[in-house]
A protein has these predicted regions:
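Conserved phosphate- and dinucleotide-binding cores of soluble alpha/beta proteins
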Residues: 1-213
Length: 213
């Protein structure tokens, strides 16, 4: 299945996120338009340690930005991706790809994930709105926790400031939290970021609220 090209907001969001990703880091990101933008727009070589791998990794490799062999649980893309991956030891079981101890060791691990809802303290909901289910929890909490444990790593929640005219910031999540606030280091939008590291609850509220104003 062909990947959907990023829109300008995804490119801007990717550029804002990539400021925090050091050369040689291990990057985890989702399979959507933001993930595609991240892999296409990085200007420093990176390692990929993620759950689902798409065609964007082929583009990354062609431009000399891929270090070592990527690790993933699934492939999802076109024949170009499958041909590129054929014979390579890329795919692993979830017991390997989502292992927090492994992810938190070695090179800095930077997890970049999205959110449907974020509350003023940084709790994240990725599964739906109210009774409407959008998707499963996937590896969201695993990767965020591993990035927090990683020396030099970062857990980043990256979201457009508005989606379909609505802010992802809500007073209260409409579903249970998918990822707890303490596993979120940074919230990044296309126009800025909130650095929550070391912030107490009142500071978190102020930083997050200001970001989405």
């Amino acid at each position: 299945m062909p990947q959907k090209d990023p829109e300008p907001v995804h490119d801007a969001l990717a550029d804002a996120v990539l400021r925090f990703v050091p050369e040689g880091a291990r990057l985890q990101c989702g399979p959507g338009q933001l993930g595609t933008a991240l892999l296409r727009r990085t200007t420093v070589p990176l390692r990929i340690d993620t759950g689902l791998l798409t065609d964007a990794v082929v583009d990354m490799d062609k431009h000399g930005m891929l270090i070592d062999m990527p690790s993933a649980t699934y492939l999802f893309g076109t024949e170009e991706l499958y041909d590129w991956a054929d014979g390579k030891p890329i795919l692993r079981g979830i017991d390997y790809t989502h292992d927090l101890t492994r992810l938190a060791s070695r090179e800095p691990f930077v997890a970049v994930n999205t959110a449907i809802e974020i509350d003023p303290f940084g709790q994240v909901n990725v599964e739906g709105r109210g009774e409407k289910v959008v998707g499963g929890i996937g590896g969201h909490p695993d990767y965020c926790a591993a990035a927090r444990m990683s020396h030099g790593g970062l857990s980043i929640i990256a979201v457009p400031s508005t989606v379909n005219g609505h802010s992802p910031l809500v007073d209260q999540l409409s579903r249970p939290a998918s990822t707890p606030a303490h596993d979120v280091d940074l919230i990044v939008t296309e126009s800025g970021h909130a650095d929550l590291r070391g912030a107490d609850w009142s500071q978190r509220r102020r930083l997050i609220t200001t970001l989405f104003q």
